[in-house]
Design a protein with these regions (language model features):
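FAD-binding core of FAD-dependent oxidoreductases
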Residues: 1-10
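Conserved strand-to-helix beginnings and helix N-cap segments that scaffold or border functional pockets
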Residues: 2, 89-92, 122
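A short helix-breaking turn/cap at a secondary-structure junction
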Residues: 9-97, 142, 146
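Beta-strand segments within the central parallel beta-sheet cores of soluble alpha/beta enzyme folds
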Residues: 59-62, 112-114, 152
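Short, surface-exposed loop/helix-turn segments at secondary-structure junctions
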Residues: 60-61, 123, 173
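Short helix-loop capping/hinge segments that flank enzyme active sites or metal/cofactor-binding pockets
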Residues: 72-81, 126-174
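Acyltransferase
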Residues: 90-115, 136-147, 171-173
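Acidic helix-start/capping segments at beta-turn-to-alpha-helix junctions
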Residues: 115-127
Length: 174
């Protein structure tokens, strides 16, 4: 997520709350548009300004929004996938800091262990990567994806190339 990579606070709103009209989608069926800000309060202010109906995006709901500001987290139990926080990766320090902050604010953190078979990651990755490959098809077919700086195994240009082999059946079943 972009906020994790730059150390800011991000809000990924529920699908249908903020227009995607004019945004460059990576995955048209899963993408959401939300603010990147200095704090949760700033995110709430920006979200309140950008939410709502747009004639160019028929997926939107006109639902109210209130943000109380100060919230007592001591009554919250927050589950997190422990295995996702065990590894050291490029932005793991931000993820681990989030857990420490939630605990400091009084939330009860509950590590959850699930088999990979129980997680929808595979289905989500098929959808995300197939739609991203379609969105960036012209970039891939013209070989301009080779101009992108990051070319490691899991970089987007390689995901675009590999996703061209996802069948329609796999995509629909995901």
């Amino acid at each position: 997520s972009p906020s994790t990579r730059c150390g800011t606070t991000g809000l990924r709103p529920t699908y249908g709350r903020v227009t995607r009209s004019g945004a460059m989608a990576l995955s048209w069926s899963m993408d959401k548009v939300g603010p990147l800000c200095r704090s949760a309060t700033d995110c709430a202010i920006v979200f309140d300004a950008i939410r709502g109906l747009d004639v160019a995006d028929k997926t939107l709901l006109d639902a109210g929004f209130t943000y109380p500001g100060e919230v007592d987290l001591s009554s919250l139990r927050i589950g997190y996938f422990k295995s996702d926080f065990d590894d050291d990766y490029e932005v793991s320090k931000f993820d681990k800091q989030t857990l420490r902050t939630l605990k400091k604010l009084g939330a009860e953190l509950i590590p959850v262990e699930l088999d990979n078979d129980d997680l929808p990651y595979y289905a989500m990755s098929i959808i995300l990567e197939a739609e991203a490959a379609a969105a960036f098809d012209e970039l891939t077919r013209s070989d301009r994806d080779s101009l992108l700086v990051s070319q490691h195994r899991y970089a987007w240009p390689n995901k675009f190339r590999i996703a061209r082999y996802i069948t329609a059946v796999e995509y629909i079943q995901a």
